[in-house]
Curated annotation (Swiss-Prot):
The lineage of its organism: Bacteria, Bacillati, Bacillota, Bacilli, Lactobacillales. InterPro entries: Cytidylate_kin (IPR003136), Cytidylate_kinase_dom (IPR011994), P-loop_NTPase (IPR027417). It comes from Leuconostoc citreum (strain KM20). Belongs to the cytidylate kinase family. Type 1 subfamily. It is found in: Cytoplasm. It is an enzyme of class 2 (transferase). The keyword ATP-binding applies. Keywords: ATP-binding, Cytoplasm, Kinase, Nucleotide-binding, Transferase. This is Cytidylate kinase.
Length: 225
């Protein structure tokens, strides 16, 4: 077990995980690991290689030759696929709608989980995703399960898309999120589920600062000797 301090934040799509995790990491001076970005990058890699998303073995073979890395950036950290920056490209609708399938492949998860654990074992981390508290960092000192209503999550995604010049109507986003929730919670390998020792935090109707404050108090309590 690592002697570093590990904070796991899990939850469904658009619950606010990455937004909250980034702020906490900055405040605590911890390393932020966006595991979802790793799966998204692999999804984009498959697309760029001309692979069908259903080609599990092809995706697994490609992963062995794929380097995924992060670099600090403002306002968000930068993501690289081999030597190309893909920070924006991995947020496309096509990647979003296919990442659950790529993430369901056993060998893909095993490889990326190993990479994620290597990072967590060398420094203090905040890691967010779907299975951090249950699979990736089962011994994390703090586990948070972040949730929000489907409508609120769709509205958040709508605002994000609009800011990027992308137009997808609210009802479509609601449907996409419900579909993603089902895929994530029903996959055979590491489904989205609240760890038994995770603390549930509902962000519906809450400001970002209120959620950050609530989780900061949880962390401080755990850090007391």
């Amino acid at each position: 077990m690592s002697h570093n301090f590990q904070i796991a934040i899990d939850g469904p799509a658009s619950a606010g995980k990455s937004t909250i995790a980034k702020i906490l990491a900055t405040n605590l001076k911890y390393v932020y690991v966006d595991t979802g970005a790793m799966y998204r990058t692999m999804t984009l890699a498959a697309k760029q290689a001309g692979l069908a998303y259903e080609d599990e073995q092809g995706v697994v073979d490609l992963l062995a030759k794929t380097v995924i890395r992060f670099e600090p950036g403002v306002p968000t950290q930068r993501v690289f696929l081999n030597d190309s920056e893909v920070t924006e490209a991995i947020r496309s609708t096509e990647v979003t709608n296919n990442v659950s399938l790529i993430a369901s492949y056993k060998a893909v998860r095993a490889d990326l989980v190993r990479r994620q654990r290597d990072i967590a074992n060398s420094q203090n981390v905040i890691m967010d995703g779907r299975d951090i508290g249950t699979t990736v960092l089962p011994n994390a000192q703090v586990k948070i399960f972040l949730v929000a209503s489907v409508l609120e999550r769709a509205e958040r995604r709508y605002k994000e898309n609009k800011a990027k010049g992308m137009t997808v109507d609210l009802e479509t986003l609601k449907s996409d999120i419900e579909t993603r929730d089902y895929k994530d919670s029903h996959r055979a390998i590491s489904p989205l589920i609240q760890a038994k020792d995770a603390i549930l935090v509902d962000t519906t109707g809450q400001s970002i600062q209120a959620v950050v404050s609530e989780i900061t108090k949880i962390i401080e309590k755990k850090q007391k000797p």
